[in-house]
């Protein structure tokens, strides 16, 4: 697998530097021992103040940065909640979706649009050229850590949002070994010792409602130009490779490769016969099935993180998604449900997290 060249990442630059400040110290010289002793005696009555300052400096050095982490299955509303929170708290968002880090396929990967970002800065979103290799969990840990430092240096709160729980664990775990998959055998490999002071919010939706919503979302994505986007992306050489890397793992790419192999995009075929229609429908059905499989896998991993000791607070977005699915329901009703059952509880959780010492 090609290793990613981090010099190609726009988000990583020379401005990510760390300066270390050391306390002044006295050098020990025999000729000045008597004067040093005299100095120590003169300062003795102020020793409690000095000790207090040193203790505070030590606490400051050991204090962990606070971060907010939005978890949830694909389509559950993580991006919306992260932006909603970022407009209420001084925050910037770090993408933790391993597919959305790459340039291109904005519809297929369901990247949040510029309009929906509402001016909130987003990091590690659509910044990596897919031709430069695959971003590993270890590389994400390094890149995202630098972004956290930069955001906190601006006195803002990093909000981490995305569906790749392996990336989330890589960034947050105090002990991280890239050779092991922490989710491979229960929660025994998941680190409960975290590098940051984390506020975890899990946006959850009931299975039946989320399933119906994801089916409809795929249809809406196809209507929005996903098929045309995939036809432009199709590469007959790369699609034939046994192992897929990076953005070529995105749901939609492998599912339509078989279709485009049979009906190449460069050939203008106006007529859609029954065979071509069946091949198209099969690809769409495969996307729906694989999207649902991904959602269930993501929820299982979140439960594993919780079992490992991560203090994850759950907010239920089911009513909001039911309102979206109902044709008779107005947008106002959907927004009311979202704000009452998802946003307001999340704001309270974040406020409590930020005021904790």
From Swiss-Prot:
Enzyme Commission number, as recorded: 2.5.1.112, 2.5.1.27
Induction of the gene: Down-regulated by cytokinins.
Deletion phenotype: No visible phenotype, due the redundancy with other IPTs.
Cellular component GO terms, alphabetical: chloroplast; plastid
The organism's place on the tree of life at top rank: Eukaryota
Biological processes per GO annotation: cytokinin biosynthetic process; secondary growth
Enzyme kind, highest EC tier: transferase
Subcellular location as annotated: Plastid, Chloroplast
Alphabetic keyword roster: ATP-binding, Chloroplast, Cytokinin biosynthesis, Nucleotide-binding, Plastid, Transferase, Transit peptide
Transit peptide: 1-71
Skewed-composition ranges (Low complexity): 20-39
Cited Gene3D superfamilies: Crystal structure of tRNA isopentenylpyrophosphate transferase (bh2366) domain, P-loop containing nucleotide triphosphate hydrolases
Function: Involved in cytokinin biosynthesis. Catalyzes the transfer of an isopentenyl group from dimethylallyl diphosphate (DMAPP) to ATP, ADP and AMP. Adenine, adenosine, isopentenylpyrophosphate and 1-hydroxy-2-methyl-2-(E)-butenyl 4-diphosphate (HMBDP) are not used as substrates.
Name this protein carries in UniProt: Adenylate isopentenyltransferase 1, chloroplastic
Native organism: Arabidopsis thaliana (Mouse-ear cress)
Designated gene of the protein: IPT1
């Amino acid at each position: 697998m090609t290793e990613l060249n981090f010099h190609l990442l726009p988000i990583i630059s020379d401005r990510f530097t760390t300066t270390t400040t050391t306390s002044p110290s006295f050098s020990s010289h025999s000729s000045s021992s008597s004067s040093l002793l005299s100095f120590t005696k003169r300062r003795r009555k102020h020793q409690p103040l000095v000790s207090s300052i040193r203790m505070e400096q030590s606490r400051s050095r050991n204090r962990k940065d606070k971060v907010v982490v939005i978890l949830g299955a694909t389509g559950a509303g993580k991006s919306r909640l992260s932006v909603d929170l970022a407009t209420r708290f001084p925050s910037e968002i770090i993408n933790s979706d391993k597919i959305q880090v790459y340039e291109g396929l904005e519809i297929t990967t369901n990247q949040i649009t510029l309009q929906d970002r509402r001016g909130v800065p987003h990091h590690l979103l659509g910044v990596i050229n897919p031709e430069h290799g695959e971003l590993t969990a270890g590389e994400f840990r390094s890149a995202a850590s630098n972004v956290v430092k930069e955001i906190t240096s601006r006195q803002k709160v990093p909000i981490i949002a995305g569906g790749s729980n392996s990336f989330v664990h890589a960034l947050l775990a105090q002990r991280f070994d890239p050779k092991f998959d922490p989710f491979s055998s229960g929660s025994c490999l998941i680190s409960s010792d975290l590098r940051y002071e984390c506020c975890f919010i899990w946006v959850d939706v009931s299975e039946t409602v989320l399933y119906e919503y994801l089916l409809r979302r795929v249809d809406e994505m196809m209507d929005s130009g996903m098929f045309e986007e995939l036809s432009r992306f199709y590469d007959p050489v790369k699609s034939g490779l046994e192992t897929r890397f990076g953005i070529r793992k995105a749901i939609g790419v492998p599912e339509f490769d078989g279709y485009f192999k049979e009906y190449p995009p460069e050939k203008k075929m106006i007529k859609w016969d029954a065979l071509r229609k069946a091949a198209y429908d099969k690809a769409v059905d495969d996307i729906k099935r694989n999207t649902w499989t991904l959602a269930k896998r993501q929820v299982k991993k979140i439960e594993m993180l919780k079992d490992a000791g991560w203090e994850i607070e759950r907010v239920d977005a089911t009513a909001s998604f039911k309102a979206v699915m109902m044709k008779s329901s107005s947008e106002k009703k959907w927004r009311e449900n979202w704000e009452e059952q998802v946003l307001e509880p999340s704001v309270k959780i974040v406020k409590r997290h930020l005021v904790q010492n």
